[in-house]
Amino acid sequence: MAQPLCPPLSESWMLSAAWGPTRRPPPSDKDCGRSLVSSPDSWGSTPADSPVASPARPGTLRDPRAPSVGRRGARSSRLGSGQRQSASEREKLRMRTLARALHELRRFLPPSVAPAGQSLTKIETLRLAIRYIGHLSAVLGLSEESLQRRCRQRGDAGSPRGCPLCPDDCPAQMQTRTQAEGQGQGRGLGLVSAVRAGASWGSPPACPGARAAPEPRDPPALFAEAACPEGQAMEPSPPSPLLPGDVLALLETWMPLSPLEWLPEEPK
């Protein structure tokens, strides 16, 4: 009698608690003609390790985050459309302003440059305006070369004033202004030094009574008597070696009016 190729399985192994219907049996020690591991259908169940996709049920709930994502997308689309609309409005306003400015510029172009019935683009209008302005500058002698030539001529002639047609940064005008500022500073320093020298030499202050007094009135007379005592005699100050006589006379006779002389004259 022929022996079976595979030994019979023991009943204890088949009824073992460690191996259920979802477990696969271990392979036998001997090589059988066919594999003991057959398809899952032969065992009547699927392996526990293999994931099985459960079919979708008709009553299942959706993810709660899905509606919020939809609302956010709708809101962002509305914001984007509003921003695009505002940008379009700004661009339209800018183009209208530019067209209005070019229309005003074309009004100043003569018919010989821009005929009345001829339509011009923005670039053509700007080019014609530039050419017309250059032509007027050349006719009036206001070109850059003419202005520089005039500045050089006036600078060589030693004119004290700058060229009235030149801008503020004209070389001749800047040189003239620098010389005038230097002379003014020198005069100011000389006057300040003269005043300081006169004060250091101690020339006595002038008395208001020495000047030609106005009509005799009581308050000025009292002020003059208080300022110049009877025993004090006004003597001319000695000439200073640092100041000429006319400067000293001017400094001695100059004095601000007294507060009493500021009062208005009473009607008689």
Swiss-Prot record:
Region entry 2 X 2 AA tandem repeats of G-Q, spans: 182-185
Bias-annotated ranges (Polar residues): 36-48
Annotated motif CPLCP, positions: 163-167
SUPFAM superfamilies noted in UniProt: HLH, helix-loop-helix DNA-binding domain
Keyword presence, Acyltransferase: no
Other facts: The N- and C-terminal domains are separated by a 2-repeat G-Q region.
CDD domains in the cross-refs: bHLH_TS_Mesp (cd18938)
Gene: MESP1
GO molecular function: DNA-binding transcription activator activity, RNA polymerase II-specific; DNA-binding transcription factor activity; DNA-binding transcription factor activity, RNA polymerase II-specific; protein dimerization activity; RNA polymerase II cis-regulatory region sequence-specific DNA binding; transcription cis-regulatory region binding
Renumbered residue ranges of the record's region Disordered: 17-93
InterPro entries in the record: bHLH_dom (IPR011598), HLH_DNA-bd_sf (IPR036638), Mesogenin/MesP (IPR040259)
Name by which UniProt lists this protein: Mesoderm posterior protein 1
Gene3D superfamilies in alphabetical order: Helix-loop-helix DNA-binding domain
GO biological process, one term: secondary heart field specification
Stretches forming Sequence repeats: 182-183, 184-185
Comp. bias regions, Low complexity: 66-86
Main location group: nucleus
GO cellular component: chromatin; nucleus
Domain of life from the UniProt record: Eukaryota
Domain bHLH: 82-136
Compartments reported by the entry: Nucleus
Organism in which the protein naturally occurs: Homo sapiens
Reported function: Transcription factor. Plays a role in the epithelialization of somitic mesoderm and in the development of cardiac mesoderm. Defines the rostrocaudal patterning of the somites by participating in distinct Notch pathways.
Alphabetized UniProt keyword annotations: Developmental protein, DNA-binding, Notch signaling pathway, Nucleus, Repeat, Transcription, Transcription regulation
